[in-house]
Amino acid sequence: MKTALRGAGRVLLVLVALFVLYQLWIFTLVLWWSHFNPSSTSFMELRLDELQAKRPDVELRHEWVPYDRISIHLKRAVITAEDDTFIDHDGFDWEGMQRALEKNQRKGRAVAGGSTISQQLAKNLFLSPSKSYFRKAQEALITVMIEAVWSKRRILEVYLNVVEWGNGIFGCEAAARRYFRVAASRLGPAEAARLAVMLPNPRRYEKQFGPRLAAHARRIRSRMVYATVP
């Protein structure tokens, strides 16, 4: 009995050590990426694997652009559409989560999310689209790391450069050129609002941008002038 307990204890210690090492590895990358741009993300690698399973020669559309070369209209539109308390929160919008929970309960299904830009970035950089309690806990921990190390300006810069905007399309520069044939720096208010409302489901809205989504884009355009941008 004692031998079995000692064995179980060793296994537990090994698991704890591996968990701690994994968190240290993530934190090291967070520190590194506070000064250097990530060349890829977990989401990018996942999508590339999916695309190459059908077409081995396919490549992602992605081009990094610095913060100052991203349209102010896109920054305002994305904050308005995805996280209107971005400047003020510490990574989590507790009131937004509560509103999303209440809306989902009324509808009887998941129709709204309460994830902030920081949480979405944590998921995009390190995790997968899968849903589990462990993944949500890991997302929260990475969000704390990012908010502790990066400025809001850096968070928004990385987010706009790595977020998915269509099938194989990542980052605002690739999205601007794909949908409007302009650089990200030249996006106007209407174009920025349209890109912003695609973010919840970009691969679907790339093909199905109907009247309801167009109306949502107009609402975002009317409100985004009030957004505070870092």
From Swiss-Prot:
Gene3D superfamilies: Biosynthetic peptidoglycan transglycosylase-like. The keyword Membrane applies. Its EC number is 2.4.99.28. It is an enzyme of class 2 (transferase). Keywords: Cell inner membrane, Cell membrane, Cell shape, Cell wall biogenesis/degradation, Glycosyltransferase, Membrane, Peptidoglycan synthesis, Transferase, Transmembrane, Transmembrane helix. It is a single-pass membrane protein. Pathway: Cell wall biogenesis; peptidoglycan biosynthesis. GO terms for molecular function: pentosyltransferase activity; peptidoglycan glycosyltransferase activity. It is found in: Cell inner membrane. The chain crosses the membrane at residues 11-31. Belongs to the glycosyltransferase 51 family. Peptidoglycan polymerase that catalyzes glycan chain elongation from lipid-linked precursors. This is Biosynthetic peptidoglycan transglycosylase. It comes from Aromatoleum aromaticum (strain DSM 19018 / LMG 30748 / EbN1). The lineage of its organism: Bacteria, Pseudomonadati, Pseudomonadota, Betaproteobacteria, Rhodocyclales. The gene is mtgA.
